[in-house]
Regions:
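Short loop/turn motifs that connect adjacent beta-strands in outer-membrane beta-barrel proteins
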Residues: 16-21, 42-48, 97-106, 152-158, ...
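Extracellular loop and loop/strand-boundary signature of outer-membrane beta-barrel proteins
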Residues: 21-25, 73-80, 128-134, 170-176
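Membrane-embedded beta-strand positions of outer-membrane beta-barrel proteins
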Residues: 22-28, 37, 50-54, 90-92, ...
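Transmembrane beta-strands of outer-membrane beta-barrel pores
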Residues: 26-32, 54-60, 96, 113-119, ...
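Short sequence motifs at beta-strands and strand-loop junctions characteristic
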Residues: 27-31, 80-85, 101, 134-141, ...
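Gram-negative (and chloroplast) outer-membrane scaffold detector with strong preference
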Residues: 42-127
Length: 193
């Protein structure tokens, strides 16, 4: 039975999802910012697509600021955290207005879920000392929001999404157990050959 269901599911996925897009971009969120890579498979009806993405976040402290050190002549960050998160998310986009809008943009609703690998380094010392043996944990995560695909020449597109990033932690990291918040997600995509 499992083999039969696997065969049906794989046939459904590969037969109906012919357009594959690869992309990269930036994320700007309540807890920090980062970069990501993504892969999207669009259904032949163009009503929905499946997504997978890997993100890299640099988490900022709420009181972190940059100052100028007159002694060294360098700018430096004060009050920062040595915390990185690597969310790996899978989900779908739903395009409710396919065939109803004549221009080259497509609004959508999106939901993604997955895991978040958190790396918590020491707060002081050199770069090597801070990241020599970081505390790690894997916790659930997700993203829910809305967005628009702007289709460009040459089968490329720019996607802009806004929504809620859900990043609860299994245990406290740097005094917090939840790094959830608003997120702006900008992606530059190109159809794979």
């Amino acid at each position: 039975m499992k083999l039969f269901l696997s065969l049906i599911l794989s046939t459904f996925l590969y037969a109906e999802f012919g357009q594959i897009h690869n992309g990269f971009g930036i994320d700007i969120g309540s807890s920090g910012s980062g970069i990501f890579i993504t892969r999207q498979a669009t259904h032949e009806s163009e009503k929905f697509s499946l997504n997978g993405e890997l993100r890299f976040y640099d988490i900022k402290a709420s009181d972190e600021t940059i100052i100028y050190n007159y002694y060294s002549g360098q700018y430096q960050s004060v009050g920062g955290k040595s915390l990185m998160m690597l969310p790996f998310l899978f989900g779908a986009n739903y395009y409710p207005f396919v065939g109803q809008i004549e221009n080259n943009f497509s609004p959508f609703i999106t939901a993604r879920v997955g895991g978040v690998l958190s790396l918590d380094g020491k707060e002081t010392g050199t770069f090597r000392e801070r990241w020599k043996s970081p505390d790690t944990q894997i916790s659930p995560g997700g993203f829910f929001g809305i967005g628009i695909d702007f289709k460009l020449v040459g089968q490329s597109s720019v996607s802009v999404m806004v929504g809620l990033e859900v990043l609860p932690m299994n245990k406290k990291i740097d005094g917090m157990d939840d790094y959830s918040g608003r997120l702006i997600h900008i992606s530059f995509n190109r159809r794979s050959k």
